[in-house]
């Protein structure tokens, strides 16, 4: 990986970063262990929802992506929160290396991974052409020996993915095909997370991609206010939560963010109101922030918590016992 040099000296690994990420300064809080994500029996089982409260996590994107910078970005946010994230969100291309050094670092600190695994053409998958590769990925996940959330081809309802997904029926067939290969490989440590966009429930596009109750462990949505004007978290997620309420499944908000364009004080108010929505809906069992500014998106599509007003509101949420249920296992 460019910008990352690992030197082993006296059994210690020293990471030299040539493209350093300018992370926020530590708050001085004591760093505590990650609140543990529960499993049914042992660490090699799939993660299960907490009986009370909700897991809290994030994708923390550095300005310049390297493995070292990703680790530093997560570490910096955790220093400010005062404890490790229960869930660390990572993104994985269809045939990318796995696990990465950052994946292993997050697992080693006691966090659980939410792996957003990108797809390929759904009809290619169901043809069997990629079966060997899918088996390889299944063995990689199994070999971790730790619980993970696995989110295959998230936001599949987006119009710009239609040439790859083709239709809801094609997507469901590909999902079932992948799950069958994982089951045959004996992968028991992955909870399968189905995660379209929240917008897909207001425009009616998402439901056609649902694989069915027997094939999904967690129902999820990525929730961002639409471009142009102000939209609350509640108005963004309400259609999704209404749909999810008809299913006996734990709910995850896999990504959410408040645009930088709103300004510091409105962002803080938006976050505090979002917390109230989550706490009031006991079906929501995991909440993950998208702490990044994607390239070329402008202020309306940037969500990183760089201003102290919004960051303070965010930290007050992350610090609440409701979002640290693992401590009460």
Q: Which stretches of residues belong to each language-model region?
A:
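N-terminal carbohydrate-binding/catalytic regions of secreted carbohydrate-active enzymes
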Residues: 56-147, 266, 270, 276-282, ...
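C-terminal region of N-terminal signal peptides and the immediate post-cleavage residues
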Residues: 10-39
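Conserved, mostly hydrophobic/aromatic
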Residues: 88, 150, 217-219, 255, ...
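Active-site cleft segment of glycoside hydrolase catalytic domains centered on the general acid/base Glu
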Residues: 132-218, 222-236, 266, 296-315
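N-terminal export and membrane-targeting signals
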Residues: 1-6
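Aromatic-lined carbohydrate-recognition surfaces of secreted/lumenal glycan-active proteins
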Residues: 58-61, 179-204, 250-261, 286-292
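Solvent-exposed loop/turn segments at secondary-structure junctions
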Residues: 63-65, 93-96, 119-123, 154-159, ...
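Glycoside hydrolase catalytic-domain groove-lining segments
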Residues: 101-111, 116-118, 221-262
């Amino acid at each position: 990986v460019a910008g990352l040099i690992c030197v082993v000296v006296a059994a210690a690994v020293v990471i030299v970063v040539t493209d350093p990420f300018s992370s926020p300064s530590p708050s001085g809080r004591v760093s505590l262990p990650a609140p543990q994500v529960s499993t049914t029996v042992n660490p090699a089982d799939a993660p299960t929802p907490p009986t009370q409260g909700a897991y809290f996590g994030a994708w923390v994107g550095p300005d310049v992506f390297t493995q070292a910078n990703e680790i530093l970005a997560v570490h910096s946010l955790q220093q400010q929160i005062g404890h490790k994230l229960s869930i660390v969100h990572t993104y994985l291309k269809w045939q990318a290396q796995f696990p990465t050094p950052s994946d292993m670092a997050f697992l080693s600190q006691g966090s659980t991974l939410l792996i957003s695994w990108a797809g390929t053409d759904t009809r290619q998958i169901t043809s069997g052409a990629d079966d060997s590769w899918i088996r390889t990925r299944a063995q990689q996940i199994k070999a971790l020996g730790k619980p993970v959330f696995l989110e295959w081809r998230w936001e599949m309802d987006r119009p710009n993915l239609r040439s790859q997904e083709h239709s809801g029926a094609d997507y469901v067939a590909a999902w079932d095909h992948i799950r069958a290969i994982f089951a045959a490989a004996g992968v028991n440590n992955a909870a399968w997370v189905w995660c379209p966009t929240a917008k897909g429930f207001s425009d009616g596009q998402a439901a056609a991609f649902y694989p069915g109750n027997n094939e999904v462990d967690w129902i999820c949505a990525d929730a961002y206010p639409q471009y142009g004007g102000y939209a609350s978290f509640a108005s963004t997620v309400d259609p999704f939560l209404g749909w999810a309420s008809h299913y006996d499944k734990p709910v995850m908000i896999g990504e959410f963010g408040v645009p930088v364009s709103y300004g510091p004080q409105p962002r803080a108010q938006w976050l505090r109101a979002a917390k109230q929505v989550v706490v009031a809906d006991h079906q929501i069992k995991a909440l993950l922030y998208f702490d990044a500014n994607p390239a070329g998106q402008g202020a309306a599509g940037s969500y990183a918590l760089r201003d102290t007003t919004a960051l303070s509101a965010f930290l007050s949420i992350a610090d609440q016992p409701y979002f640290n249920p693992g401590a009460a296992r």
